[in-house]
A protein has these predicted regions:
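NTP-binding/hydrolysis catalytic cores, primarily Walker-type P-loop NTPases
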Residues: 105-110, 226-265
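Conserved nucleotide-binding/hydrolysis micro-motifs of P-loop NTPases
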Residues: 39-40, 90-93, 136, 158-160, ...
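Beta-strand-loop-alpha "switch" segments that mediate conformational coupling across diverse proteins
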Residues: 186-189, 198-232, 243
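Inter-motif core of Ras-like GTPase G domains
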Residues: 124, 138-159
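Walker A/P-loop NTP-binding active-site region of P-loop NTPases
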Residues: 2-69, 127-128
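Conserved C-terminal guanine-recognition region of P-loop GTPase G domains, centered on the G4
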Residues: 165-177
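P-loop/Walker-type NTP enzyme "switch/lid" segment
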Residues: 39-121, 223-226
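Well-ordered beta-strand positions
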Residues: 128, 150-153, 181, 211-213
Length: 265
């Protein structure tokens, strides 16, 4: 299954959740691939600290194959399964170049992503692929959502962000009949208690969308600045335990097949 982890605004914890879910599934024995598609603000390189000859940017620009981009990090993290990571180029020059890309390039990049899902799922036999996308309605994030089987939307309780998220799901995800699940992050304790009494659904427009996770704000995680993979290094941390429950819910959303361009309502 390909999961695009998306948000309406930056700063929701999208990358942290992408990273820890990917590592958790690999820890469970799955073959997992994590791709940094936040080309305008890449951050996974902070965790993995690798200098690559080829980046995701190069793959999307047809300068290399995806095999040239992926790095197997399984042995470094001691996982039961496999975790391969594709990093975006964090240099200022590369970020400026991505920001200047026109619509024609973005359309060609969509074709590369469609080809990528076939290679990752059919040729390289990954069980799960996580796209850590750019926030908002950038072409690159829309491309990732279109290509994925599931859009996993990370939001907070901020009123403006919640409203923007609702509009994004209603106007974009519904357009592509995209299967969607929601994570609400950085919730204060009072709201979290109220959330636990709900039925696990949120209404947007005329449809009900599943909430697969409700996470409080953890100050110690903020202080780590992405250096720790909690689900592997601190499996008993409350954040890790909550993601374990979240992973069970995501497994149940697995489509019947992930080898076509699935768009499931």
């Amino acid at each position: 299954m390909i999961i695009a982890v998306h948000s309406y605004k930056g700063g929701t914890g999208k990358t942290l959740i992408s990273l820890n879910l990917a590592a958790l599934f690999a820890k469970m024995g799955k073959r997992v691939c994590l791709i940094d598609l936040d080309l305008r603000a890449p951050s996974l390189c902070t965790t993995f600290g690798k200098r690559n000859r080829f980046w995701v940017n190069d793959y999307l620009s047809k300068a290399c194959t995806i095999e040239n981009v992926l790095t197997d990090c399984s042995s470094n993290i001691a996982l039961k399964g496999k975790l391969c990571v594709g990093l975006a180029n964090p240099s200022i020059e590369a970020i400026r170049e991505m920001t200047a890309k026109d619509r024609k390039w973005e359309m060609e990049a969509l074709g590369r992503l469609v080809s990528l899902r076939r290679v990752l799922m059919e040729d390289l036999h990954f069980d799960y692929v996580f796209f850590d996308t750019s926030p908002g309605l950038q072409y690159s994030s829309i491309n990732a959502v279109i290509t994925a089987d599931l859009a996993l939307v990370v939001t907070t309780t901020d009123e403006a962000e919640s409203e923007g998220t609702r509009l994004m799901i209603r106007d974009l995800y519904d357009l592509f009949a995209k299967k969607t699940a929601i994570i609400i992050n950085k919730i204060d304790s009072e709201c979290l208690s109220a959330m636990s009494r709900r039925d696990g659904l949120i209404k947007i427009g005329s449809r009900q969308w599943p909430i697969v996770g409700a996470l409080p704000c953890f100050c110690d995680i903020l202080e780590d600045e992405g250096r720790c993979i909690y689900t592997v290094e601190k499996p008993n941390h409350p954040f890790s335990l909550m993601l374990q429950e979240m992973a069970k819910k995501l497994e149940k959303l697995q489509p019947a097949t992930s080898h076509g361009l699935c768009q499931i309502s």
